[in-house]
């Protein structure tokens, strides 16, 4: 079974403080003079009609790029889980897929593995061979009440 693109909202998580990067908004990083977030957005377009950015600053800049940004519902930069919660609250689709804005190497293989499912699930998370990478997730919207912070 494959999940249809009409059933997925994809949210690129860019709402952090970026303390390890001196406060630079990771969503606005560039490689070869191209914004990473636009690169990710362009890949996401193949897998969903509903693509958003979760950001807590520079919302006007994202808008100028043609992106729609959702600010965290919870205040004070509470981390990626707050972005996931905001995404589940705002999404109108059955599934929400999240990925971080600072992962430019994500490719079509990742998306295909996440949406080509052969069993029922509530949440799927990527695994890099050593650890689970929970910000790379596909979550049923039904889990929203379980996540309430």
Provide a role label for each language-model segment:
Residues 2-149:
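Nucleotide and nucleotide-moiety/phosphate-recognizing core
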């Amino acid at each position: 079974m494959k999940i249809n693109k009409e059933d997925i909202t994809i949210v690129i998580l860019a709402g952090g403080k970026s303390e390890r990067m001196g406060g630079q908004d990771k969503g606005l990083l560039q490689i070869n003079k191209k914004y990473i977030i636009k690169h990710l957005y362009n890949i996401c377009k193949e897998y969903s009609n509903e693509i958003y950015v979760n950001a807590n600053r520079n919302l006007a800049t994202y808008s100028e790029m043609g992106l729609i940004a959702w600010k965290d519902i919870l205040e004070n930069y509470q981390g990626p889980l707050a972005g996931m919660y905001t995404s589940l609250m705002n999404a109108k689709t059955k599934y929400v897929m999240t990925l971080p804005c600072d992962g430019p190497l994500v490719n079509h293989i990742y998306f295909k593995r996440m949406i080509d499912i052969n069993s029922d699930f509530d949440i799927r998370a990527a695994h890099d061979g050593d650890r689970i990478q929970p910000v790379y997730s596909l979550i049923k919207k039904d889990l929203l009440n379980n996540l309430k912070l």
